[in-house]
Amino acid sequence: KYYLNFIKSIKNIDEKLLLQITNLISEKIKKKSQIFVAGNGGSSSVANHFLCDFNKGVMLSSRYKLKPKIISLSNSIEMITAISNDISYDEIFTLQLKNYVRKGDCIICFSCSGKSKNILNLIKYANQNKIDVILFQGFGSKAKNIKTKFYINLKHENYGITEDIFSSTMHVMSQYIRAQYTAKNQIL
């Protein structure tokens, strides 16, 4: 049943929207913009995996023509615990972003519920500073008062399926970009 639910949910993703997101990411990489990724729990693993597949995979597949600048805000346990302890867990992503973000950068958030205060604060900060936001959400409705350039809601309440789809869409995007630079699209 898990697998069938996974297949059903992944088929509900709007392919045109996913392609638009992938093209935005590709453009940001070509312009040498930074792309920040963030998530909590299992979604933080997706954010960190995103960093790996793009920074290494895309760079090598493009034979160094593309050099992605992916920064995971979920990656440094030292920063996360210092900010949590000294300021607030709700600021673990925003405070890091303030240190690095530049005009033209982009943020990608992975959130099962879409209600995590640290993710919402990050998106609000990005909105205030005109930074493009892409939000992948598992279930529930989009929080009020936040704006995203692109938004995908999987509408599935199983955390495992949601996080598997987050991971799968990340692979689809990275491999699509990689295939553009690989002979005969060998990756796909």
Stretches with model-predicted labels:
Residues 111, 137, 152-160:
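Short beta->alpha connector loops at strand-helix junctions that form conserved
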Residues 135-148:
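Short, glycine/polar-rich helix-capping loops at beta-to-alpha or helix-loop-helix junctions
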Residues 43-48, 115-122:
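Short glycine/serine/threonine-rich phosphate/pyrophosphate-binding segments
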Residues 1-13:
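Generic N-terminal amphipathic, Lys/Arg-enriched alpha-helix
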Residues 32, 104, 130-131:
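Glycine-centered short loops/turns at secondary-structure junctions
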Residues 13-31:
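A short, well-structured juxtamembrane/interface segment
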